[in-house]
């Protein structure tokens, strides 16, 4: 069986944790930040986890 190719777009956006979960960065922190509160911008800096429904698909895209 041939080796699986890594989806390069997914590799840039997601990282696997040691426990097998998938981390992602949060959206809405790129531009138009003047109308957003400091607290909201601070929470966008925190990393989130991919939902359980999407995790198997992402794991297939980043096998290594």
From Swiss-Prot:
InterPro entries: Ribosomal_bL35, Ribosomal_bL35-like, Ribosomal_bL35_CS, Ribosomal_bL35_sf. Residues 1-25 are annotated as: Disordered. GO terms for biological process: translation. GO terms for cellular component: cytosolic large ribosomal subunit. GO terms for molecular function: structural constituent of ribosome. Keywords: Ribonucleoprotein, Ribosomal protein. Belongs to the bacterial ribosomal protein bL35 family. This is Large ribosomal subunit protein bL35. It comes from Koribacter versatilis (strain Ellin345). The lineage of its organism: Bacteria, Pseudomonadati, Acidobacteriota, Terriglobia, Terriglobales.
